[in-house]
Amino acid sequence: MGQIKDILTTLLPLVVLFLIFYFLIVRPQRQQQKKHKEMIESLTKGDKIVTQGGLIVEVLKAEANFFSVKLNDDTTAKLSKNYVAFKLDELDQFGLAEPIVIQQGREEISAKLSGAKTLKQRQITTE
């Protein structure tokens, strides 16, 4: 009976640490990977995506392991499905698809993440 208690008191902290590790790191990562895979499988012609390299491209055709994408009016390329970062529409959920204007003194730097014309500009003042 005493040996079983010793084994339980030794293993219990390890089991608790494993459970904490699983629920805080492994499980959320698997859920995120599952959502990303579903997003990649749902991409169709005309969807705009952002690559892991930061390029904003439009999907022309989905193939087995690649997407045929349009970089601009004249340039098409093939993109591995492994290098899709996210769908551009996902930014709209967080309000990040609006043009961003950064003011530093007298200089203005504007960046536009999507081509929509009816978006409001955000003012971010840095000092």
UniProtKB/Swiss-Prot annotation:
The chain crosses the membrane at residues 6-26. It is found in: Cell inner membrane. One of its GO terms (cellular component) is plasma membrane. It is a single-pass membrane protein. Pfam families: YajC. NCBIfam families: yajC (TIGR00739). The SecYEG-SecDF-YajC-YidC holo-translocon (HTL) protein secretase/insertase is a supercomplex required for protein secretion, insertion of proteins into membranes, and assembly of membrane protein complexes. While the SecYEG complex is essential for assembly of a number of proteins and complexes, the SecDF-YajC-YidC subcomplex facilitates these functions. PANTHER family: SEC TRANSLOCON ACCESSORY COMPLEX SUBUNIT YAJC. This is Sec translocon accessory complex subunit YajC. It comes from Helicobacter pylori (strain ATCC 700392 / 26695) (Campylobacter pylori). The lineage of its organism: Bacteria, Pseudomonadati, Campylobacterota, Epsilonproteobacteria, Campylobacterales.
